[in-house]
Amino acid sequence: WIMGHMVNEIYQIDEFVDLGANSIETDITFDENAVAEYSYHGVPCDCRRWCHKWEYVNDFLNALRRATTPGDSKYRRELVLVVFDLKTGDLSSSTANKGGKLFAQKLLQHYWNGGNNGGRAYIIISIPDIDHYAFISGFRNALKEAGHEELLEKVGYDFSGNDDLNSIRNALHKAGVKDKEHVWQSDGITNCILRGLSRVREAVRNRDSSNGYINKVYYWTIEKYVSVRDALDAGVDGIMTNEPDVIVNVLNEKAYKQRFRLANYDDNPWETYQ
């Protein structure tokens, strides 16, 4: 999965897919009532990126729905996975549950079209703070209460704060998520700073072990050719990047062409390849 980083304005959906992304990451900020308000990152953000692009969340979700609904004039067949990077820093552990519930209701209305032929992309809820695990519980419960538990088949989970893997596993269990139940594990840092791959390798070992909790591992945010090759050699399933075309170029290199291909809609992002 080539994951376009910081796609927060509607026009960027096409921009990143045109560059080769089959997945995008969108930042979501919350107001004081735990309501998702903007698709917005703010400063600081990655080097060589403008940090201030934004939309109202409802507008972005409506556009995203169109981009992932077959038959729509805005449909982009390649776009199969969306990561919502949830900026839960202003939520407390007590309002996280409410935030998750309200965000699920927003997705249900604006992205899934009330459960009636909405957007088809798989969704990852990515949370920076393991203490906010109740966001996931609230999200899951809201869909169940709305009578749309089936949409959870399309939802996966990630904690992005580079915490100890066992701590993340415990947070997932507290949220009601079982081992290997749609779990993506991220590792990374802003592209301004170099980061080693030791934790990535630990996550890959967990993914590949019979008693791990992880389905997929992704690394963020890189666009240097050597970094991309190193990440692929470490066995990641996804790379988050500001320059999707760089990842496309590396995947076309002889050393990687046989081992990797771009994921499409028929590839289940919750299955671990053996």
UniProtKB/Swiss-Prot annotation:
What does the record note about the cofactor? Answer: Binds 1 Mg(2+) ion per subunit.
Give the EC number.
4.6.1.-
Enumerate the residues binding Mg(2+). E25, D27, D85
In terms of one coarse class, where is the protein primarily found? secreted
Reaction catalysed by this enzyme: an N-(acyl)-sphingosylphosphocholine = an N-(acyl)-sphingosyl-1,3-cyclic phosphate + choline; an N-(acyl)-sphingosylphosphoethanolamine = an N-(acyl)-sphingosyl-1,3-cyclic phosphate + ethanolamine; a 1-acyl-sn-glycero-3-phosphocholine = a 1-acyl-sn-glycero-2,3-cyclic phosphate + choline; a 1-acyl-sn-glycero-3-phosphoethanolamine = a 1-acyl-sn-glycero-2,3-cyclic phosphate + ethanolamine
Q: Which cysteine-cysteine pairs are annotated as disulfide bonds in the entry?
A: C45-C51, C47-C192
Quote a single Gene Ontology cellular component term: extracellular region
The keyword Metal-binding is assigned to this record:
yes
Q: In which tissues is it expressed?
A: Expressed by the venom gland.
The cross-references to InterPro entries, in alphabetical order and at most eight, read: PLC-like_Pdiesterase_TIM-brl
Q: Where in the cell is it found?
A: Secreted
Q: Give any GO molecular function from the UniProt entry.
A: metal ion binding
Sorted alphabetically, which Gene3D superfamilies does this protein's record hold? Phosphatidylinositol (PI) phosphodiesterase
Which cofactors are reported in the record for this sequence? Mg(2+)
Keyword list (alphabetical) reads: Cytolysis, Dermonecrotic toxin, Disulfide bond, Hemolysis, Lipid degradation, Lipid metabolism, Lyase, Magnesium, Metal-binding, Secreted, Toxin
GO BP annotation list:
killing of cells of another organism; lipid catabolic process
Catalytic residues, per the record, are H5, H41
Which EC class is this protein assigned?
A: lyase
User: By its UniProt entry, which CDD domains does this protein fall under?
Assistant: GDPD_like_SMaseD_PLD
> Could you say which protein family the record assigns here?
Belongs to the arthropod phospholipase D family. Class II subfamily.
What does the UniProt function comment say about this protein? Dermonecrotic toxins cleave the phosphodiester linkage between the phosphate and headgroup of certain phospholipids (sphingolipid and lysolipid substrates), forming an alcohol (often choline) and a cyclic phosphate. This toxin acts on sphingomyelin (SM). It may also act on ceramide phosphoethanolamine (CPE), lysophosphatidylcholine (LPC) and lysophosphatidylethanolamine (LPE), but not on lysophosphatidylserine (LPS), and lysophosphatidylglycerol (LPG). It acts by transphosphatidylation, releasing exclusively cyclic phosphate products as second products.
Q: What is the name listed in the Swiss-Prot or TrEMBL entry for this protein?
A: Dermonecrotic toxin LarSicTox-alphaIV1
Organism, as annotated: Loxosceles arizonica (Arizona brown spider)
